[in-house]
């Protein structure tokens, strides 16, 4: 799986990230798994056409010492579909920028 990983989180960093993600995206559905909706303006043509699969998401996996973001755009509505695919360059950059901005907002240094 292609991922953006930030490791060696301190306990206080983990707590701040968990609180922020819980507040912004709802509590983790499974142990540390957060579903981050992909901005509609960066969906690929195929993803935009698949209204029955919306919203599309990135997965963030937060555990005690690391945060991992999968570069797979997926749907909660289907397991297999043409719109489920690895992120485009703009989607990948959007996710990295989102995470980097969260770290900046929370003043977490890595």
Please place each PLM-identified region on the residue numbering.
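Short, charged/polar surface micro-motifs in flexible loops or helix N-caps
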Residues: 11-12, 40-43, 64-67
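C-terminal basic regulatory modules in eukaryotic proteins
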Residues: 54-110
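Short, surface-exposed beta-strand/loop "edge" segments at domain boundaries and coil↔beta transitions
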Residues: 12-15, 43-45, 76-80
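Short, intrinsically disordered, mixed-charge
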Residues: 19-27, 101-108
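Terminal, regulation- and interaction-focused segments at domain boundaries
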Residues: 1-17
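Long, compositionally biased, intrinsically disordered segments
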Residues: 2-5, 29-33, 91, 101
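Residues in well-ordered beta-strands of folded domains
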Residues: 7, 35-37, 61, 70
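Ser/Thr-rich, low-complexity intrinsically disordered terminal regions
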Residues: 22-55
């Amino acid at each position: 799986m292609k991922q953006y990983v930030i490791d060696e989180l301190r306990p206080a960093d983990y707590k701040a990230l968990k609180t922020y993600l819980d507040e912004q995206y709802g509590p983790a559905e499974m142990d540390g798994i957060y579903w981050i909706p992909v901005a509609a303006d960066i969906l690929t043509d195929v993803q935009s056409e698949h209204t029955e699969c919306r919203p599309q998401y990135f997965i963030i996996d937060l555990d005690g010492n690391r945060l991992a973001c999968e570069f797979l755009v997926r749907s909660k509505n289907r397991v297999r579909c043409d719109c489920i695919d690895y992120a485009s360059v703009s989607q990948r950059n959007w996710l990295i920028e989102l995470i980097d901005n969260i770290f900046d907002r929370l003043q977490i240094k890595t």
